[in-house]
Amino acid sequence: MGIKQHNGNTKADRLAELKIRSPSIQLIKFGAIGLNAIIFSPLLIAADTGSQYGTNITINDGDRITGDTADPSGNLYGVMTPAGNTPGNINLGNDVTVNVNDASGYAKGIIIQGKNSSLTANRLTVDVVGQTSAIGINLIGDYTHADLGTGSTIKSNDDGIIIGHSSTLTATQFTIENSNGIGLTINDYGTSVDLGSGSKITTDGSTGVYIGGLNGNNANGAARFTATDLTIDVQGYSAMGINVQKNSVVDLGTNSTIKTNGDNAHGLWSFGQVSANALTVDVTGAAANGVEVRGGTTTIGADSHISSAQGGGLVTSGSDAIINFTGTAAQRNSIFSGGSYGASAQTATAVVNMQNTDITVDRNGSLALGLWALSGGRITGDSLAITGAAGARGIYAMTNSQIDLTSDLVIDMSTPDQMAIATQHDDGYAASRINASGRMLINGSVLSKGGLINLDMHPGSVWTGSSLSDNVNGGKLDVAMNNSVWNVTSNSNLDTLALSHSTVDFASHGSTAGTFATLNVENLSGNSTFIMRADVVGEGNGVNNKGDLLNISGSSAGNHVLAIRNQGSEATTGNEVLTVVKTTDGAASFSASSQVELGGYLYDVRKNGTNWELYASGTVPEPTPNPEPTPAPAQPPIVNPDPTPEPAPTPKPTTTADAGGNYLNVGYLLNYVENRTLMQRMGDLRNQSKDGNIWLRSYGGSLDSFASGKLSGFDMGYSGIQFGGDKRLSDVMPLYVGLYIGSTHASPDYSGGDGTARSDYMGMYASYMAQNGFYSDLVIKASRQKNSFHVLDSQNNGVNANGTANGMSISLEAGQRFNLSPTGYGFYIEPQTQLTYSHQNEMTMKASNGLNIHLNHYESLLGRASMILGYDITAGNSQLNVYVKTGAIREFSGDTEYLLNNSREKYSFKGNGWNNGVGVSAQYNKQHTFYLEADYTQGNLFDQKQVNGGYRFSF
């Protein structure tokens, strides 16, 4: 086989050795196989051999080399070439195994010492264990080349592979497993290792890959390490995944993974040039950073993910240290940090550039920073998303550093009170700078402490949090918003606020009740909407009242809208005034987006001097005082009559208060509708010869209630039905006593909405019909009314309320018919009078907007005096009565009041009216009576149109 061995054995000697070591030799003795088959058929040989030494070594496929020879230092080795300029040529074929176990010294697997040597193998396995140290493969000779093919494995209890002196090594699907030492060490200029695809390096106690072009001839170029789909998994204190020193170039291809587990065990530590795509780095030890660059440029492409359980994600710290961490919109990168920061630039020329990256920091409540620039470091970001848990800060710059952000920016802190963007002042340093421009979604506060912060918020931006600018060290906070929203969560101040079609909302965030915010702005410009809240009541009647406040200390410009939130639960009186905007120049213009409902009254915004204030609609502003004029010489007094005082303006109720207060009118009018005349209830009872009646009537119409007091008018359609029966008590006395029940349904339309009302009632009556034309009618009624309404407030929010009240009434009616014909038939006149007393209980409603509406009870005494002109025709057992009527009505009582959150408003039903009507009552066969009436009432407080019809059966 032409094998040159360290012990100089011949072929015969080799066979003798095989006789001992190989079971194949036993087959020769029995003639099973020939000698030529053993010599010339290597597929049948899996030989064990000892240490191999020389310049030309060839090992058969599948052979096993066991280190049994020591080098001059007394250390066992497996394969070794001599040192010097004589190149070695080592061919280890396929599936060869090299085992070295030095129980007392330094175990060496394969040592290539000759210059320009070569090592070839495929599916090679090297397994070395040494007492003091071990090395799997050591390529010492200058310009040595090793090709380890596919699927080779190096196992060592110390170092895996050391290569230097501008040598090269290639392999694919390569495995290094070792403890204590470094998995792969690449030294010197020009040294190159290419591990192809699918290789794996596992170490326990030290670094996975070390590369440093620090020695040798720099003309040979940088040291290089190349791999793709590489896995590095290391354990131990300061055990780095890859340690890249100066003059080194590392290309990790695509889908490589680095895992470390140990304190200070960084994933990638670099002073050189590193590139990777779809890189995963996962480090779990204390103070272990994912990627730390101390020099050179590290470029990490799309779909890369860095996770550090207790350290930083990315950090640059050193001269011209640069990290480019570049994801794409389709394949975003990510950083997770459970330690100090997500990404950090920590020295004057250190830079971190990121694109399309999601950053999460969570240190279990302790301080952590999403982006951290310090000591002159610079961070740039394009389309970043930062999520900060409790205790974290989103973006932080200090000690003359700079952060520049563009495109979409998301900063989501766990609460709006946490710092989303902040600078820190440090004595002796220039102000740090943070610039952001793009569409922003920020949940957190922005604080300029001795720094310069500029936010240019593009359309669709939303910021929820507060702001602070302390103006130390020339620091400023300038914000420009275009079609964006700022939800102000607490007292804030900034230097410049330039708004274009944007909203500043003091009210959207769920702050503590009664807690308001003041926004101090030095310079305001543009056009915007400010959404605000107000407690105009304060300690009562406006004393020490408060609300959200916009305070402009410098220049103001533009046209702005104030949208002040309605608050129905406010116990207002309509006399309060509250300043909501303060300016020094009064140059900007502010107007209300709508009237404001506070309690039961409407408020508006007006300018007073250079400020704007909230006041109850209808009140007159206090005049701005003029300077006292220079006194003129005394003149004789001229006495003028006092001018006629103008009516004092009154506050206007809200739509909710109006609908609630108007239920006084609804209840009053329902009573009016239900308590009608005897003719309307039962038709003409004269010439009645029967003992009893059963009757049914229905009615319907419309009412228009006029504005009165502070209540606006409304109209109401209604319909109802009554059913009753009576019995004549005696043949000699025409007195009928009966019972009835009824129900009325109404649909009031208010100025701000509509509602429903229902009255269910029952009662009894006694009617007396004398032969001389006199009659009287007594009616007693008890009722229960239910009311509900739905209105839109001044800001188009729906408001609902409902309530129930009981009432009773007593009505006494009397009249006398005078026939104008001696026959007793034909034309007649009939004067009538009626007096109705009603009592309505109090009622309380709480509207859905918080307004409490209390309607006091009231008494009503309604009088009516009417005249009927009719024509009566009798034919056999039938009778027809046609009539017209007219009369006056008057409310003698009806004083009441209603309370809007305990603010009293008086109301009265007193007034006069005129009632006119036409009707017919037809009796057939002295049993069946049909009656119909239409009438119209015109009064001071309401108008009514009604049609009434019924049927009576007499028995």
Swiss-Prot record:
Any coiled-coil regions, as ranges: none
CDD domains, per database record: PL1_Passenger_AT (cd01343)
Keywords annotated in UniProt: Cell adhesion
SUPFAM superfamilies associated with the record: Autotransporter, Pectin lyase-like
GO biological process terms on file: cell adhesion involved in biofilm formation
GO cellular component: outer membrane
Biased composition range(s): Pro residues: 622-652
One Pfam family here: Pertactin
UniProt note: phenotype after gene disruption: No change in cell adhesion or biofilm formation.
Superkingdom per UniProt: Bacteria
Region (Disordered): 616-659
SMART domains from the UniProt entry: Autotransporter (SM00869)
Keyword match Transmembrane: no
PROSITE patterns: AUTOTRANSPORTER
Domain Autotransporter positions: 687-955
Main function: Upon overexpression shows increased adherence to polyvinyl chloride (PVC) plates, increased mature biofilm formation.
PANTHER family per record: ANTIGEN 43-RELATED, AUTOTRANSPORTER
Name this polypeptide is given: Probable autotransporter YcgV
